Amino acid sequence: MEVYNDYNSNLTNLFFCVKERPLALITELGFLPLNSRDDFDAIYRQLKCEEFDDEYLAIELELADKYFSPLHAKAIKALLLKRAQRGNVRRAANYYKLIRYSFSGAGKSFGGKPCNIRNFFADIWRCSRRLENVVIENKDFESLLAQYDRPDAFFYCDPPYYNAECYEVEFTARS
């Protein structure tokens, strides 16, 4: 079993969309122009606000109530909400562009070398095939280790660099 885990939800959402929705991600990337610092700043602000809508979510939630018993509908709706949060293609496309067009791929400031986003479509497709049997998680390391620890498990944990400025999530000396 292979598991990819990161505490950064934007990164795990991107990997989830590459794995589960590569064609939708490629399509969305084609519709999101990024040609200037202003475009970069707009995407950066949008990602900070975390305001992304799944246009079909409301319909799917209604259908769950209509076609399933209340107990089953509740479970299905919880799964739909979790999937919508993890599988947000627009958010993934924005994050991908942010890291591709930023200085050192950090996603903080505009300054990457010019490139055509369409050149990355084949990479996304290949990555999707590679991730086919990989479980993608967004957990802290303790929860992940507790869930997947087995006698034959191998873990590589890239530790956070304490007091570094390059992380989207906060780390303390104990985490």
Regions found by a protein language model. Give the residues of each.
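Class I S-adenosyl-L-methionine-dependent methyltransferase module
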Residues: 2-135
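Residue-level preference for short coil/turn positions at secondary-structure junctions
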Residues: 132, 150-151
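Conserved SAM/SAH-binding loop
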Residues: 139-143
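Short conserved loop adjoining the S-adenosyl-L-methionine
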Residues: 144-149
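Conserved acidic-Pro-Pro-aromatic motif
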Residues: 151-175
